[in-house]
Amino acid sequence: MKSSQTFEEQTECIVNTLLMDFLSPTLQVASRNLCCVDEVDSGEPCSFDVAIIAGRLRMLGDQFNGELEASAKNVIAETIKGQTGAILQDTVESLSKTWCAQDSSLAYERAFLAVSVKLLEYMAHIAPEVVGQVAIPMTGMINGNQAIREFIQGQGGWENLES
C-alpha cells in the first residue's frame, strides 16, 4: 500500500523521528508513530513505517566515518545566529562530495542522506539544546533537492530505501 502522506510530509516525519531517537535513545519504541498516522482511504495500513525507515537511515549514517566535529560545530554556531539553512546544505554537500571522492562506488545521494543523518546525530549529542532548530531546515534541504528526491522515489519511496 502507498502512504496517504506526501513525500514532504513523510520526510518531515522521518527527520522528526530521527531527532527524537537521537535526543532520547531509550524512547525509540515510544516514538514509533510520532507524526505518522498511516492508513489509506480503504482503511488498510500502508507500508510507510517511520521506525523502520529511521532505522535504515541510522544504519546508512553509521557507514559514514568522516570527520564531523568541525563541521558540526560550524553548523551549531550558525544555527545559534539563526543562519541554519545555507550552512547546513553547504556542509552536507561538501562532506558528501568528499566521501564520494574517497569511495567511487558510493552514490552521491546515499552519501548525502548518510551525512545528513550522521550530522543530525552528532549535533544531538553535542548540542541537544540547538539541534531542534535544524529539523525544519534539514527537512527542507532533503525535500528541495531534486536529485535526492528522485533517488528516493526511484527506490519506490522512503519505505523501500535500503541501508
From Swiss-Prot:
InterPro entries found in the cross-reference section: Bcl-2-like_sf, BCL2L15
SUPFAM superfamilies: Bcl-2 inhibitors of programmed cell death (SSF56854)
Keyword Ion transport part of the UniProt annotation: no
GO cellular component, one term: cytosol
Gene Ontology biological process terms from the UniProt entry: apoptotic process; regulation of apoptotic process
Keywords: Apoptosis
Disulphide bridges, residue numbers: none
Signal sequence bounds: none
Source domain of life: Eukaryota
Gene3D superfamilies named among the record's database cross-references: Blc2-like (1.10.437.10)
Name of this protein: Bcl-2-like protein 15
Gene: BCL2L15
